[in-house]
Amino acid sequence: MQTLLLVDDEPNIVEGLASQFEGRYGGDVIVLKSFSGLHALSILQNNKVDVVLSDIRMPDMDGLTLQRETEALWPHIHFVFLSGFDDFQFIHQASKSPLYHGYLLKMEGDEVVLNKIDQEIAQCAAEARAELEQGEMQRRYARMQGFLQRAALEGFVRGGGSWQQIQHSLPNLAMTL
């Protein structure tokens, strides 16, 4: 299950988007809301969030500062910025971060925002699946390696192979003598 954090100092924007995302995703995505950058940072310090959709200009902490503060907490989070201003200097600064995943203008409309967040949620879900699969492969490899080590030792004890063959096999089995 993915988590989306909406951050904007305009409550009507946050509430409107939250309503649309909750209707769109049902219970498949947790939607968190914040009306300030500082409050959003507090949420991020206490919750695993996959995607942040944040305004740029907010009174207590701007979106760029929020992104920078979040980088140490969650290095794989996806940040998408939403603004009423076409600020190329800001876009340039924000895009330097590995967390940056896009910049949308509020005037582009809800459908553009919804589609972009759909893409980010799908990408986060794919990344989570890949991480689980990698973990499962590592567990299987560890189990298999133990089996191979036992089999090799049994073969060595029974006289199966020359000393040179044994020495050559040990590094591949993560073993030393």
Task: Locate predicted features.
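Active-site residues of response regulator receiver
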Residues: 8, 55
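Two-component/phosphorelay signaling modules centered on CheY-like receiver
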Residues: 11-32
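Helix N-cap/capping motif at the beta->alpha junctions
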Residues: 18, 33-42, 63-65
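Receiver (REC) domain active-site loop signature in two-component systems and cognate sites
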Residues: 58
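Alpha4 helix (beta4-alpha4-beta5 surface) of REC/receiver domains from two-component response regulators
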Residues: 65, 86-103
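Interdomain helical linkers/hinges and coiled-coil/dimerization scaffolds
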Residues: 95-96, 102, 108-177
